[in-house]
Amino acid sequence: MGQKINPNGFRLGVNRDWEAKWYADKNYADTLNEDLRIRKFISEKLADASVSTVEIERAANRINISIHTAKPGMVIGKGGKEVEALRKQLSALTKKNVHINIVEIKKPDLDAKLVGEGIARQLEARIAFRRATRQATQRSMRSGAKGIKVQTAGRLNGADMARREWHTEGSVPLHTLRADIDYAWVEAATTYGQIGVKVWINRGEILPQRKNKPSKKTKGGN
């Protein structure tokens, strides 16, 4: 089961949190559609800012958006002009009070989406897929990853027949729930067609904190 299911959804509530934190009853469809519009707008507006995750939290007429990016300076801009302009545009889009929080990704080579986008950009620049995947996996391992697995699928190197190839380094235990597995799927638009890139990164194990049990008193003890 762990081999087939999305590792991010498989670990929700265990060592991963939801990217959308809100509750809606009758207006669920409208709220979800608004979330999709927000994410699409941010991904198009900040296409070159290495944005990985967008977290949306709602409370009454207020929307809190956390943008995880490897280039916070590009998102914030000089004196905060860029992020303020983005906030106003999102407020106009949603007609709600929007607050934006920028979270820096300190190790982008351990983020599956950013690694996948880097491979996709190289494939679009006609770099050989084996070279692109090998370099990406080596950078991730040097950054502290316990393991990484990359799958590329499509007309690789312009071949007439589409195929699927894997490149793995280290250990990627998909069945182990305590393992911090980051997963992403990205598409590269090449002249030969679309090439899918899937990335799994094992960032180590997250062990639950043990509660200290009260020591049992021995008979006759003080």
Curated annotation (Swiss-Prot):
Keyword terms, alphabetized: Ribonucleoprotein, Ribosomal protein, RNA-binding, rRNA-binding
The species this protein was found in: Lactobacillus gasseri (strain ATCC 33323 / DSM 20243 / BCRC 14619 / CIP 102991 / JCM 1131 / KCTC 3163 / NCIMB 11718 / NCTC 13722 / AM63)
GO biological process, any: translation
Assembly and oligomerization: Part of the 30S ribosomal subunit. Forms a tight complex with proteins S10 and S14.
Family assignment from sequence similarity: Belongs to the universal ribosomal protein uS3 family.
A GO molecular-function annotation: structural constituent of ribosome
Protein name per the record: Small ribosomal subunit protein uS3
Gene3D superfamilies membership: 3.30.300.20, Ribosomal protein S3, C-terminal domain
Record carries keyword rRNA-binding: yes
Domain KH type-2 as annotated: residue spans: 38-106
Signal peptide: none
Function: Binds the lower part of the 30S subunit head. Binds mRNA in the 70S ribosome, positioning it for translation.
GO cellular component, one term: cytosolic small ribosomal subunit
Record-linked InterPro entries: KH_dom, KH_dom-like_a/b, KH_dom_type_2, KH_sf_prok-type, Ribosomal_S3_C_sf, Ribosomal_uS3_bac-typ, Ribosomal_uS3_C, Ribosomal_uS3_CS
Keyword flag RNA-binding: yes
